[in-house]
Each structure stands twice: as C-alpha cells, then as structure tokens.
C-alpha cells in the first residue's frame, strides 16, 4: 500500500478503491506504513493534538490506537520520532520532554499492545 504526503499536513492512500485523507492543522512529524500489520503510524504535532500525538490507523482510516504518554516522573509532551524498522514488534521512539535540552528520553514502543517501556536517555544534538 502506498501513502502519499499531499503537503506537510495531509496524507492520503487508497483503500478498496476509495481515497482516504487524513488532515491536521499543523505539520505531521512522521508517517510510516507498517506492512506486516497493514496499518499506518502517524506522529502529529503535539502543539495541535496534545501529548497523545501518536496515532495508529488501519487501512480504512479508522484509529486503532492513540496511546497515552507514559508516566516517567516528568512531563511528556508527546512522541518526537520513531526509529521504525519493518517487522519488529518493539520499536524505538524518542519522547518530547521539556526538562533537559541535552538529552531526550528514548524507549521501546510495542506495536502489539501499544505500551511504552525500557526508558533511557539519549544524546540530543541540536
């Protein structure tokens, strides 16, 4: 399945002969098609949608998951990015946290139960 970015705020694909469009008011950070699951992963701008800015959609355009951010003892503003590798059920994501400008929190995100785990700091290069 092919996903097309219309612009910074809109993506589309074809499902059963019909076009599916997803639009946001602000920039979409990242889009991934998860071939094995036949689902789309979209990271939207947290300033538009809040901390729950990670969305998983099925190919018909229905939301499969929109997980709450984990409680890690500090504010989590949302997901910054995913280091997506096709076929892996546990993916590495980088969380947006305001407390430290030199390091960010990375963790594992399960594509099975949509939970976050295995938190650690990673160097952030500005």
Set out the residue ranges of the language-model regions:
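Repeated scaffold domains used in trafficking and secretory/extracellular systems
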Residues: 1-2, 24-39, 43, 71-86, ...
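Short beta-strand elements that form the blades of beta-propeller/WD-repeat-like
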Residues: 1-5, 12, 36-49, 89-100
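Surface-exposed loop/turn elements that mediate protein-protein interactions on large endomembrane-trafficking
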Residues: 7-25, 53-72, 101-123
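Extended aliphatic helical segments
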Residues: 11-14, 20, 31, 49, ...
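A mid-sequence interfacial segment
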Residues: 75-115
